[in-house]
A protein has these predicted regions:
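Conserved N-terminal/central alpha/beta ligand/cofactor-binding core
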Residues: 42-135, 140
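A conserved FAD-binding loop/helix module that cradles the flavin
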Residues: 178-191, 195, 422-450
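Beta1/beta-strand and adjacent pyrophosphate-binding region of the FAD-binding site
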Residues: 2-16
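Residue-level recognition of phosphate/Mg2+-coordinating polar/acidic sites
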Residues: 45, 66-68, 76, 85, ...
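Glycine-rich loop(s) and the adjacent beta-strand/alpha-helix scaffold that form part
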Residues: 169-217, 234
Length: 454
């Protein structure tokens, strides 16, 4: 059995873990000769989940100021404030620039690597940690953590290869449950619980929500589901799902009703995919939808195809279009359903029309405005951790000091990143949470270590 001693051990080589390593090494190296900061990553290389972020482009932060940024953080944005001000979005861009990665900013204050390659973000994070003196060890699957208050080195971390790493401080940054193929399998929740921490209810967020009839859900597939309302993304599309899949709606309104009450509404882009309703506003609404479904509530999505037009004005416009079609000699001998299709081509994307007709069989030129302003879809489920962007819930932030991210229950233990009961909307918020909390945890662990050794 191989024993290795370190000053600080960081479990997890994702966004939070790499930033914790950089912050810890930078801080400790200024006060101590030959500090040893070790990152233990179970995957063959670090930053696996970052690599798939933003379809490989990696929207790594958002440049909104704190007042606007905090509106996109759940459930208690105030907890993030000390971490954010220690490492703001602007500072993160400078941080990456200092190790050779330039950025660009696109619509919605979203920042991307100038190369549009997520791998550049990972490479920059690894460089920053290693330049500061941290060691990143891959293929190191942690199987046990022991906290021994009487020992000089308070933490003993055992890996599957029988190697044991001991340290004064331990930072756990193992991520959540989303995209388990990248290594996020929820290990950190168990370790946190073993050390006395409570875990707030976990559920998928920033995921596809599935309308009734969108997928061929069978009793057998329901039995295989891991949680109430979970519909595996691999479940085949139904006839309706196939008609809708691939449609991308621009500048529409989306309202979510929970048990008949309006819960939220958004304006923007909505996509029908092989998973269900996605896109920026679909993802943003998913948090409330999933939570409601898990708790047994009825969820309904209402799409406003013409949010910029009042229904009265839309009715006038449609009546005018209908009269023009009726007067057109080319329509004189056409059946009503064919003239109605012509009308639909003037108010809907062509690709969407077959699905719209099938799902709204009673719509006609008189009721079309009402249907366009309120296309209702009852929601039966959601895509789970296999393809959700982030895990909501996590280690209770009530048990963690926000100014240091140290455990209130176990001295010398720190948490950062998705493992915390802290998550954001789509748009770069979740990676910034990971960067800011990871960096502060690393700095705090080093500062505490320095103060204890003076």
């Amino acid at each position: 059995m191989n024993h290795i001693s370190a000053d600080i051990i960081i479990i997890g080589g994702g966004a939070a873990g790499l930033m914790a390593a950089a912050g810890a090494a930078q801080t400790l190296s200024s006060k101590k000769d030959d500090p040893r900061i070790i990152v233990l990553e179970k995957m063959p290389r670090p930053g696996r989940k970052i690599m798939i972020t933003g379809k490989g482009r990696c929207n790594f932060t958002n440049l909104k100021d704190w007042n606007e940024f905090s509106e996109h953080i759940h459930p208690k944005p105030g907890f993030l404030k000390p971490s954010f001000y220690n490492l703001t979005s602007e500072k993160m861009i400078d941080f990456l620039s200092n190790v050779g990665m330039e950025s660009i900013v696109e619509r919605g204050d979203r920042a991307f690597p100038a190369s549009h390659l997520a791998s550049d973000v990972v490479d920059a994070l690894v460089r920053s940690a290693e330049y500061a003196g941290a060691e990143i060890l891959c293929g190191k699957e942690v199987i046990d953590i022991r906290h021994k208050t009487e020992d000089e080195k308070k933490y003993a971390v055992t890996c599957s290869d029988d190697s044991v790493y001991t340290s004064d401080k331990l930072i756990i940054c193992t991520g959540g449950l989303s995209y388990p193929k990248t290594g996020s399998t929820g290990d950190g929740y168990k370790w946190a619980k073993d050390m006395g921490h409570s875990i707030k209810t976990l559920f998928p967020s920033l995921t596809a929500i599935v309308p009734i009839g969108y997928k061929d859900v069978t009793p057998a597939s329901r039995e295989k589901s891991s949680a109430k309302g979970h519909i595996d993304r691999g479940t085949p599309l139904s006839e309706n799902g196939n008609l809708l899949c691939g449609n991308q709606l621009k500048n529409v309104g989306l309202s979510i009703f929970i048990d008949g009450n309006l819960a939220d509404e958004e304006f923007g882009d909505l996509d029908f995919t092989d998973g269900g309703l996605e896109g920026p506003i679909g993802f943003k609404m998913s948090r409330k939808c999933v939570n409601a479904i898990i708790n047994g509530s009825k969820v309904q999505a209402v799409i406003d195809m013409k949010p910029a037009v009042e229904i009265e004005d839309l009715q006038v416009r449609i009546a005018t279009l209908w009269n023009e079609i009726a007067k057109d000699k080319r329509s004189a001998n056409k059946l009503y359903k064919d003239r109605f299709k012509i009308l639909l081509t003037k108010v809907l994307p062509m690709q969407l029309i077959p699905a719209f007709i099938k799902l709204n069989p009673n719509a006609d030129h008189k009721t079309l405005a009402k249907t366009l302003k309120g296309w209702k879809m009852d929601i039966e489920g959601y895509v789970g951790y296999e393809r959700c962007v982030v895990t909501a819930g996590g280690v209770s932030i009530e048990e963690i000091t926000p100014k240091t991210l140290e455990s209130r229950l176990t001295p010398g233990l720190y948490f950062a990143g998705e493992l915390l009961d802290l998550d954001g909307d789509t748009g770069g918020y979740n990676l910034q949470i990971a960067f800011s909390t990871g960096y502060l945890a690393g700095i705090s662990a080093s500062r505490q270590l320095i103060s204890e050794q003076i």
